[in-house]
Curated annotation (Swiss-Prot):
SMART domains, alphabetized: EF1_GNE
Family indicated by similarity: Belongs to the EF-1-beta/EF-1-delta family.
PANTHER family in the cross-refs: ELONGATION FACTOR 1-BETA
Originating species: Thermococcus gammatolerans (strain DSM 15229 / JCM 11827 / EJ3)
Gene Ontology MF terms in the entry: translation elongation factor activity
Function according to Swiss-Prot or TrEMBL: Promotes the exchange of GDP for GTP in EF-1-alpha/GDP, thus allowing the regeneration of EF-1-alpha/GTP that could then be used to form the ternary complex EF-1-alpha/GTP/AAtRNA.
HAMAP family assigned: EF1_beta
Protein name: Elongation factor 1-beta
Record key words, sorted: Elongation factor, Protein biosynthesis
Pfam families xref list: EF1_GNE
Transmembrane domains' residue ranges: none
CDD domains xref list: EF1B (cd00292)
């Protein structure tokens, strides 16, 4: 984890409130490209029972670390409505 110098918060919205968030989180962790790290995952209540998953993705500020790779991988997972980068910060 010490090699990483950036953290991006990626907000993932499930397709509906009935989605099993534990299963969805596990699937998303599996598809995270290997070169990226994961600091933590939080759950954010939105409205009407819908809960977003917030992935704190670790990366390096160098060529080859394109967050679009993470977004595309996440968007391909079943029951994912959307995946967007909320913030990017240096660490």
């Amino acid at each position: 984890m010490s090699d990483y110098n950036m953290v991006a918060v990626v907000k993932v919205m499930p397709t509906d409130p009935e989605v099993n968030l534990d299963e969805l989180e596990a699937k998303l962790k599996e598809v995270l490209p290997e070169k990226f790290g994961l600091a933590k995952v939080e759950r954010e209540p939105i409205a009407f029972g819908l809960v977003a998953l917030k992935f704190y993705v670790l990366a390096k500020d160098e060529e080859g670390y394109d967050l679009d790779q993470v977004l595309e991988a996440f968007r391909q997972v079943e029951n994912v409505e959307s995946a967007e980068v909320e913030t990017v910060s240096r660490i």
